[in-house]
């Protein structure tokens, strides 16, 4: 193989030609940001989802399924209507739109992460940046919401969106899920499904899609109890980390154990480190090489509006560099608190103490004798507002009265003398809290592509094949008669049917020479070819050919299912 071999271009051709994946709507010219999975690709995708699902279930997480279409008020509460936006410029000549930050970084080499629309507009003007399609003048930068908008039913007032993440379907069901978990923290809930983001100018093939599959888990926990109960089981596992400080100083990654990651303060607690290890193990189980995996901490300006800290599990691509495949976001109580406020639902959990506690509380009420004549009918309303305040709000009210001498409620200016403030002691057996959330969020499409890219192998003799993890292969076994003649074909077909019944993904193929057939199945990653040759009718044995080594062993036909299970699944 010469030095001009382009792995990306070869892989794109292979995916289209052999039934892995290709751009959607081809006969109508295609549409960027959409991909179809062919028979082989759909099988691998299903296996990736299964690996993630099995890992989540082993952790004791509950699986649910919720709608893709979501009413607008859910995303108003979650902040997506206001904040799920990207900066855009439009060509005044041809009308094409582009991500402003990507355009500036690609053509000017200027990092504009965290810059405002006004600042990016100024950079475009000062450097004379033009439309890359036609050379026309670009507009000022404006923001574009990435959610696909729709309506529920025929009424325009029933606005809805295709969900940009699966997470909100879990949060709005928290009350029922908490009851299912018997009000005991921590617990995890996950779902696997489609998400949609109306990307402005998606490029990079399957790396940036408008419709994609996610596997997201929301782990609800008490923020006062951040030690994972099973951390000792994983504390010696190695993690390659790229924290913010190292990024800013260009120091590169550090490799530490999960325990060291917590002790050195790279991650905030053992909950974080535990799920980093879980994510790494899932990626390894899918077949991503360990040396191609790292965890990069997002810079503050990169984080989503709901995140207090996020680490991305990235996988290295020869074509695209480090690619985010899994996010691990600390969402705090952001989502549940917002949905409580918007919906009025109680999304708290009662935490019971081992022993009752005596606590001091502030009680505040209106001095009705003093303010009654002034407030008249509104006095009762204002008193109810005060009663609805929690301790933090009452403490702030008292602090404002002490410092400023007055506060304003419902348009009425009230002085310190208008209130009765008492400090009382109460014996309590527990407290209500809003749980915090840690979210491992897997994309499925990116790991799919990166698994194929990292599996594509070129031997010294020029053989090109997918060295995919054996249990991830889309076809696990190919049964091949040496030549298309009796009795070899009948014996081979009977073996094929037996392996089907044993649960293997298996094909029967008698077309072309045996060498061409070996190449055909090597190329798509089939780990083993079973060959029925002239010796088979004599002694009831067949050969099993290994994809990677090309070595062959002979086994009895009756031993074939057991041997293949051992070779493929261990």
Swiss-Prot record:
Its EC number is 6.1.1.14. It catalyses: tRNA(Gly) + glycine + ATP = glycyl-tRNA(Gly) + AMP + diphosphate. InterPro entries: aa-tRNA-synt_IIb, aa-tRNA-synth_II, aa-tRNA-synth_II/BPL/LPL, Anticodon-bd, Anticodon-bd_dom_sf, Gly-tRNA_synthase/POLG2, Gly_tRNA_ligase_arc, GlyRS-like_core. GO terms for biological process: glycyl-tRNA aminoacylation. GO terms for cellular component: cytoplasm. Catalyzes the attachment of glycine to tRNA(Gly). This is Glycine--tRNA ligase.
């Amino acid at each position: 193989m010469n030095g001009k071999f382009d792995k990306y271009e070869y892989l794109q051709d292979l995916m289209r030609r052999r039934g892995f994946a290709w751009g959607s709507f081809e006969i109508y010219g295609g549409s960027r940001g959409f991909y179809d999975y062919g028979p082989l690709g759909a099988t691998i995708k299903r296996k990736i989802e299964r690996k993630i699902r099995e890992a989540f279930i082993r952790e004791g997480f509950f699986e649910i399924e919720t709608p893709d279409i979501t009413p607008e008020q859910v995303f108003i509460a979650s902040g997506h209507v206001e904040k799920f936006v990207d900066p855009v410029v439009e060509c005044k000549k041809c009308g094409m739109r582009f991500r402003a930050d990507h355009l500036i970084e690609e053509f000017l080499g200027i990092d504009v992460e965290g810059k405002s629309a006004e600042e990016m507009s100024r950079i475009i003007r000062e450097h004379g940046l033009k439309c890359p399609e036609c050379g026309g003048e670009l507009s000022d930068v404006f923001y574009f919401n990435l959610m696909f908008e729709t309506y529920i039913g025929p009424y325009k007032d029933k606005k809805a969106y295709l969900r940009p993440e699966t997470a909100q379907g879990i949060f709005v069901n928290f009350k029922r899920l908490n009851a299912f978990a018997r009000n005991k923290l921590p617990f995890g809930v996950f779902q696997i499904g489609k998400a949609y983001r109306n990307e402005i100018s998606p490029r990079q093939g399957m790396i940036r899609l408008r419709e994609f599959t996610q596997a997201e888990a929301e782990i609800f926990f008490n923020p006062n109890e951040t030690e994972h109960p099973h951390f000792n089981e994983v504390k010696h596992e190695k993690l390659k980390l790229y924290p913010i400080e190292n990024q800013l100083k260009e120091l590169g990654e550090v490799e530490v154990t999960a325990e060291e990651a917590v002790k050195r303060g790279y991650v905030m607690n053992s909950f974080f480190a535990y799920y980093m290890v879980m994510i790494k193990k899932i990626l390894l189980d899918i077949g991503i090489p360990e040396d191609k995996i790292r965890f990069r901490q997002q810079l503050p300006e990169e984080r989503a509006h709901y995140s207090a800290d996020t680490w991305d599990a990235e996988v290295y691509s020869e074509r695209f560099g480090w690619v985010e495949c899994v996010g691990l976001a600390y969402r705090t109580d952001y989502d549940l608190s917002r949905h409580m406020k918007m919906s009025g639902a109680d999304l708290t959990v009662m935490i019971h103490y081992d022993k009752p506690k005596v606590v001091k509380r502030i009680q505040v009420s209106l001095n009705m004798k003093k303010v009654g004549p002034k407030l008249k009918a509104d006095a009762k309303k204002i008193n109810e507002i005060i009663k609805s305040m929690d301790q933090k709000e009452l403490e702030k009210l008292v602090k404002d009265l002490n410092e400023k001498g007055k506060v304003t409620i419902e348009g009425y200016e009230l002085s310190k003398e208008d209130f009765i403030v008492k400090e009382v002691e109460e014996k309590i057996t527990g407290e209500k809290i809003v749980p915090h959330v840690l979210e491992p969020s897997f994309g499925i499409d990116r790991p799919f592509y990166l698994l194929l890219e990292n599996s594509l192998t070129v031997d010294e003799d020029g053989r090109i094949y997918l060295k995919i993890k054996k249990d991830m292969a889309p076809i696990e076994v190919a049964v091949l008669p040496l030549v298309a003649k009796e009795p070899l074909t009948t014996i081979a077909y009977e073996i094929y049917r037996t392996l089907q019944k044993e649960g293997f993904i298996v094909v029967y193929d008698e077309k072309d020479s045996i060498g061409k057939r070996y190449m055909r199945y090597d190329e798509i990653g089939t780990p083993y070819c079973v060959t029925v040759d002239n010796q088979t009718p004599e002694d009831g044995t067949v050969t099993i050919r290994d994809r990677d080594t090309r070595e062959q062993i002979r086994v009895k036909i009756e031993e074939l299912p057991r041997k293949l299970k051992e070779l493929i699944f261990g």
